[in-house]
């Protein structure tokens, strides 16, 4: 883990960015013993250097491949971002089913930390409809905080910064700060 860990502009935050080194993880897992392949990431995260962190956040691709499976096996809980768009509901359904299989086979303590509606646009009927469906089907899991569609959230990564450092006063950055407070208050 130490070889891929990078310091960030925030002294209390380290990151393992996607890189060429990470690209090799999926084939490595695919080639591993079938009885061990789901636990590779969990084993790496239980190394002594990981113990110095209060939280380890795994940002997974929007697929249910080996990387996501390994993250679910290693995780205590899952924060699920859901774009307020139609197909996102189908993806959420698949993820929930996958989480149930992971609970049964490898990680009985895995829970949904919360479902985070993202890219919400109150002027768009579909956005509003998706948010209503989320609250209807997951009344206890949907965060109060909703992340709006926001230009800053799209621009910040191209400048190599998180939104809160790129433009802390933007609606998008403020929304993520509200989310952090909500997680800390209830987590």
Question: Model-found features: residue ranges?
Answer:
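P-loop NTP-binding core
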Residues: 1-187
């Amino acid at each position: 883990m130490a070889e891929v860990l990078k310091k960030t502009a925030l002294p209390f935050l380290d990151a393992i960015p996607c890189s060429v080194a990470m690209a090799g993880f999926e084939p490595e897992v695919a080639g591993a013993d079938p009885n061990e392949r789901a636990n590779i990431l969990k084993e790496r995260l239980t190394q002594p250097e990981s113990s110095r962190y209060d939280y380890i956040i795994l940002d997974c691709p929007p697929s249910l491949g080996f990387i996501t499976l390994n993250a679910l096996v290693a995780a205590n809980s899952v924060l699920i971002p859901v774009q307020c768009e139609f197909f996102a509901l189908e993806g959420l359904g698949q993820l929930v089913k996958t989480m149930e299989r992971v609970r049964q086979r490898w990680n009985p303590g895995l829970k949904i930390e919360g479902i985070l509606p993202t890219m919400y646009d109150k002027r768009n009927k579909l956005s509003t409809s998706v948010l209503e469906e989320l609250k209807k089907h997951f009344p206890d899991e949907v965060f109060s905080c909703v992340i709006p569609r926001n230009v800053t959230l799209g621009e910040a990564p191209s400048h190599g910064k998180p939104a809160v450092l790129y433009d802390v006063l933007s609606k998008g950055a403020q929304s993520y700060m509200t989310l952090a407070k909500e997680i800390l208050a209830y987590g």
